[in-house]
Amino acid sequence: EKRKNMNYSECIENARTRIGNYCKACPECNGRACKNQMPGPGAKGVGDTAIRNYDKWKEIRVQMDTIAENKPVDTSLELFGKKFKYPFFAGPVGAVGLHYGDCLDDVAYNDILVSSCAKYGIAAFTGDGVDSNVMVAATKAIKKTDGIGIPTVKPWNLDVIAGKMEMVHESKALAVAMDIDAAGLPFLKNMEPPAGSKTVEELRQIAKMAGTPFIVKGVMTVKGALKAKEAGASAIVVSNHG
């Protein structure tokens, strides 16, 4: 079935009937309407972290300079030997049904996201979760695009991570990430053996397991960036998990 093109307002209006109870499909995704809800995109505790993140992003502007050759602007980016059309990727979401309603399951969501990003010249980060099928679906979707996608593995214990990395290898993913800013999630801390925070040495072991460029997502300080570099990370993502 051929779908009509939608403008942003129509997209938001349509989303409100499909996206579940946590995300409110706001015109401006600023963390205010969804704060202090778990699960969901808003922040826990006093609920201002996602809000402060968004407010800080608004301070960043592209500097205009029109004194240049009159030709199309090159927005491309080269990363890990691959060239992308634009310098932004789709962020990772795991357990889609839990967070964003039952309109799409993880298999359908990842198939749409990963293939569409690859088709239009960027790449998708994919998520992870307590349901092992989340990573299975993500890596299968990435394999279909010849590795144009980046699985994001949660900071489980090392045995669980090793199993996840096998799926990453099978997918031929261009890189793999770990969202170390998920270290405080209760379902990780309550595992046996405990999961969560990782030392430099543990991250070094994980980077070796990866066998592909390893991205540490969840670095907020210079000290953290230097630790990630010491552990053998190929890149970092500045993030605090919202």
Model-predicted regions and their roles:
Residues 3-84:
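An N-cap/entry alpha-helix motif that binds or orients negatively charged groups
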Residues 42, 102, 126-129, 153-154, ...:
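Glycine- and other small-residue-rich loops at beta-strand/loop junctions that grip anionic moieties
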Residues 123, 134-159:
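Long, hydrophobic, well-ordered secondary-structure blocks that form the structural core
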Residues 115, 144, 156-242:
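Alpha/beta enzyme core
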Residues 91-106, 150-159, 212-220:
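Active-site mouth loops of central-metabolism enzymes
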Residues 45, 105-108, 193-198:
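Alpha-helix N-cap and loop-to-helix initiation/capping positions
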Residues 49-135:
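N-terminal functional module of multi-domain proteins
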Residues 88-91, 122-126, 147-153, 176, ...:
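Hydrophobic faces of well-ordered beta-strands that scaffold small-molecule active sites
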